[in-house]
Swiss-Prot record:
PANTHER family: PROTEIN PHOSPHATASE 1 REGULATORY SUBUNIT 1B (PTHR15417:SF2), PROTEIN PHOSPHATASE INHIBITOR AND DOPAMINE- AND CAMP-REGULATED NEURONAL PHOSPHOPROTEIN (PTHR15417). It holds the Pfam family DARPP-32. The modification N-acetylmethionine is found at M1. The modification Phosphothreonine is found at T34, T75. It comes from the Eukaryota. Residues 41-63, 109-118 have a biased composition (Basic and acidic residues). It is found in: Cytoplasm. It comes from Homo sapiens (Human). Inhibitor of protein-phosphatase 1. Residues 1-204 are annotated as: Disordered. One of its GO terms (cellular component) is cytoplasm. This is Protein phosphatase 1 regulatory subunit 1B. Residues 89-100 have a biased composition (Polar residues). The keyword Cytoplasm applies.
Amino acid sequence: MDPKDRKKIQFSVPAPPSQLDPRQVEMIRRRRPTPAMLFRLSEHSSPEEEASPHQRASGEGHHLKSKRPNPCAYTPPSLKAVQRIAESHLQSISNLNENQASEEEDELGELRELGYPREEDEEEEEDDEEEEEEEDSQAEVLKVIRQSAGQKTTCGQGLEGPWERPPPLDESERDGGSEDQVEDPALSEPGEEPQRPSPSEPGT
């Protein structure tokens, strides 16, 4: 089917009843709460506060509804209530600090009666122990340095005595050593004749 063939839907809206007077229509309109009025009423509405003249004119039924507190709505505390809460909190904190200070003093007094040293004496003893530990560590470092220096001086000495260079070889010894080196490969590989250079063929 083509869209042109579709029938137009006509809505029949009933006309308002003409029997009501215009004054009654205005009163009905005033009684109906608008969205703005509903928002104002739900915004921090407290039953103690007096209703505004606009709310009074809106009708008795609506006025009764506004007096009922909404359990789901959040009502922030007033400034006086916040000040009271803050004062009580500060007082509780100060009381706790005083109680802790008095308890610490009582514990210190009991410890002193039992013979425990004071905190100042304990701190002095700890400082003395730290100084002794530092002195011991410095002495150990000096010993290590001295030992390393002694090792450096003795590193040139052998097991029996100081290390010395061997005397230089004579020419004959050098020649003998070279001959030994030449003969070594023949001795090292027995059963194998040493390779000798093949004689060059005559006429080439």
